[in-house]
């Protein structure tokens, strides 16, 4: 009976070592590729988050600046991570005055054309009447009873819908300039945005001050009058807010610089806003 031969198959030591080396090279390449891809994704996601946070802050400030009273903007342009602040007065209403006091010793009440929408206030808190503000120095000099700004005590409709309202001030006042278009604004208390350390805050309800307030002087430091707008800011060597005065050919320009940073990644955002300067 013939003997059936069987063949033995296998691999040599050299083949095994070569296979291990090739597999190791492929594994290292795959791990490196996956690691780089993951790092790239995380970096991209982090930068996207920073950009989104910074853009939201800029959009918020831009929206409010479009409603700023003409010539009410003032900026503390100190560079770095100190108290960099931007201040303005938000407009509430605008109308035409009828007999505002400009001469003599002044008056504590006068008439205006009805606001649109109709506005009557029995005891307004921090509402001011403003006529023809031409610069922020004059505007914020609130202690002067002959300036462009006066605190409102009440707004009433004494004749029941005849189209004329009466504004009563908290004290006798004489406005120092007539508006060429008889324009009157109602404004709220000033609002400030400040970069303090690595955070951007919004401040309100601190009153009108001759000198611009900072967090170290007269701005509130608790909720609800201080609100966090953004964090992760490193403005070292940068100026968060800069005001370029208006000229005869263009409006005033406010420049914003925010450098958002986290985990070694940074995104710098530069933005400019044109402000109204026709009072």
Regions found by a protein language model. Give the residues of each.
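N-terminal leader/signal peptides at the extreme start of proteins
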Residues: 1-11
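Intrinsically disordered, low-complexity coil segments
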Residues: 3-5, 72-83, 123, 157-161, ...
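Aliphatic-rich helix starts adjacent to a transmembrane/signal segment
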Residues: 9-66
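Acidic/polar N-terminal loop/beta-strand segments that form early-domain functional surfaces
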Residues: 19, 91, 259
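N-terminal trafficking/processing presequences and adjacent post-cleavage segments
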Residues: 24-29, 34, 197-208
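Short helix-loop boundary/capping segments at the starts of domains
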Residues: 39, 43, 55-59, 63, ...
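Extracytoplasmic beta-strand-rich oligomerization domains located immediately C-terminal to a leader/signal peptide
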Residues: 48-203
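Short linear sequence signals and composition-biased patches located at protein termini or domain-edge surfaces
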Residues: 199-201, 205-279
